[in-house]
Amino acid sequence: MPKNNTNENFQSGAGLIRYFNEEEIKGPALDPKLIIYIGIAMAVIVELAKIFWPV
């Protein structure tokens, strides 16, 4: 008769949990607002460049 083991975990879920616990952020932490502001500033610079230096 097979032994009934009640301590078994869901194997694929355990691997994901272990993966996310070991993940580390190695890059610089940037505020999301800063990314938006940089994008807006770049768009303004490109539009001004098109006005002052038409091709």
Curated annotation (Swiss-Prot):
The keyword DNA repair is annotated on this UniProt entry: no
Topology relative to the membrane: Single-pass membrane protein
GO cellular component, one term: plasma membrane
Side Extracellular, residues: 52-55
Membrane-traversing stretches: 32-51
Superkingdom classification of source: Archaea
Signal peptide positions (record): none
Predominant place of localization: membrane
Compartment(s): Cell membrane
Annotated keywords: Cell membrane, Membrane, Protein transport, Translocation, Transmembrane, Transmembrane helix, Transport
GO biological process: protein transport
Topology Cytoplasmic: residue spans: 1-31
Disulfide bridges in this chain: none
Alphabetized HAMAP family for the sequence: SecG
Function: Involved in protein export. The function of the beta subunit is unknown, but it may be involved in stabilization of the trimeric complex.
Family membership: Belongs to the SEC61-beta family.
Complex formation: Component of the protein translocase complex. Heterotrimer consisting of alpha (SecY), beta (SecG) and gamma (SecE) subunits. Can form oligomers of the heterotrimer.
NCBIfam families on file: PRK01253.1
The protein, known as: Preprotein translocase subunit SecG
